[in-house]
Curated annotation (Swiss-Prot):
It is an enzyme of class 1 (oxidoreductase). The gene is pyrD. Keywords: Cell membrane, Flavoprotein, FMN, Membrane, Oxidoreductase, Pyrimidine biosynthesis. It comes from Sinorhizobium fredii (strain NBRC 101917 / NGR234). The active site is at 173 (nucleophile). Substrate binds at residues 66, 111-115, 170, 175, 244-245. This is Dihydroorotate dehydrogenase (quinone). Signal peptide: none annotated. One of its GO terms (molecular function) is dihydroorotate dehydrogenase (quinone) activity. It comes from the Bacteria. It catalyses: (S)-dihydroorotate + a quinone = orotate + a quinol. Its cofactor is FMN. GO terms for cellular component: cytoplasm; plasma membrane. Catalyzes the conversion of dihydroorotate to orotate with quinone as electron acceptor. Belongs to the dihydroorotate dehydrogenase family. Type 2 subfamily.
């Protein structure tokens, strides 16, 4: 449950348009006004995934801290890791405003931001000032007007190699025309070959191998999932993030806002994204790391992502409604789940409801 101060802050922020409120929240984190809410360390929640030591399985998804302004402040809220971006080589303004919409009855958000960000240079300078111990991933994308989108992803690898703990290639935003075409098998093979070749070159030069993840959409056909899984396995990719926002509008209460174009996130995405997660786990087998994202709003929904096949989970939109205390509450709740079920590690529940979720028709 949120506390009275969080509820008051939320009411104040909801008087502002969503994009202004987002900017205010970034400034609040920068200033230190938002107190640390981290849960006590719990070895049962620790995991080594893709060679990285995660203190707990909960991360902040890309999209909130686009320009790497507050990664360490987010970690102090209780997240085990955070992901900045999506960043593109050149700064870009994104799509016209308004471009973020709250669906309050649904505890959802629709956005059509379009990779608005300050560009590689600005984000790099900020990350260079961060502790090297902070577990910060860098989500990379392509400029809207790029003549060579694959080259933009390669530039992201090279630019941020010294400061990224992991990379995410975002090919699944619905708000950059043609971007999701990179999920098609031939295009995906070319992208992964180029990105991983750049990573391997940087690893050879530095002696440090940075894992690369791929973030996919939930709006995939079975054939599309087959193709992505085949390329992930063929390229020995370090992991998958499932999923980005959806274009679907099924079952929403707020039909007025539901008509807005863009990607839907928040509570209504939970079932769809979790089913796709489980289907990808079935295709990839037990060893490829998967980060589950979409509709995580509580310790129980975070745990259910793990039961469906995730190693780690991320959230963003639900914090709009639950406040900055949410990550700490989720991490404490996962510790309580370990107590209740007498778990030596949170990993013990992974895949325990894989068949159920893989069979869901959503």
């Amino acid at each position: 449950m949120t506390g009275p101060l969080e509820r008051l802050a939320r009411r104040g922020l909801f008087l502002l348009d969503p994009e202004t409120a987002h900017g205010v929240s970034i400034k609040a984190l920068k200033s230190g006004v938002v107190p640390s809410c981290a849960a006590p360390a719990d070895t049962r929640l620790e995991q080594v995934i893709a060679g990285l030591n995660f203190p707990n399985p909960l991360g902040m998804a890309a999209g909130y801290d686009k320009n790497a302004e507050v990664p360490e402040a987010l970690l102090r809220l209780g997240f085990g890791f955070t992901e900045i971006g999506t960043v593109t080589p050149r700064p870009q303004a994104g799509n016209d405003k308004p471009r973020i919409f709250r669906l309050v009855e649904d505890e959802a958000v629709i956005n059509r931001l379009g990779f608005n960000n300050d560009g590689h240079g600005a984000a790099l300078a900020r990350l260079q000032a961060c502790s090297r111990q902070a577990l910060i991933g860098v989500n990379i994308g392509a400029n809207k007007d790029s003549a060579d989108r694959i080259a933009d992803y390669v530039a992201g690898i090279r630019t941020f190699y010294a400061v990224a703990r992991y990379f995410t290639a975002n090919i699944s935003s619905p708000n950059t025309p043609g971007l999701r075409d990179l999920q098609a098998r031939e295009s995906l093979a070319a992208l992964l070959s180029a990105v991983l070749a750049a990573r391997d070159e940087e690893a050879a030069k530095t002696g440090r191998r940075v894992p690369v993840f791929l973030k996919i959409a939930p709006d995939l056909t079975e054939e599309g999932m087959d193709d992505i899984a085949a390329e992930v396995l063929a390229h020995n990719l370090d992991g998958l993030i499932v999923s980005n926002t959806t274009l679907a509008r099924d079952g929403l209460r707020d039909q007025r806002q539901a008509k807005e174009a863009g990607g839907l996130s928040g509570r209504p995405l939970f079932e769809k994204s979790t089913a796709v997660l489980a289907r990808m786990r079935k295709r990839l087998g037990p060893d490829v790391p998967i980060i589950g994202v979409g509709g995580v709003s509580s310790a129980e929904t975070a745990a259910e992502k793990i039961r469906a096949g995730a190693d780690l989970v991320q959230l963003y939109s639900c914090m709009v409604y639950e406040g900055p205390g949410l990550p700490g509450r989720i991490v404490r709740g996962l510790s309580q789940l370990c107590d209740r079920d007498k778990l030596a590690s949170i990993r013990e529940i992974r895949d325990s409801r894989l068949d159920y979720w893989a069979g869901r028709n959503v």
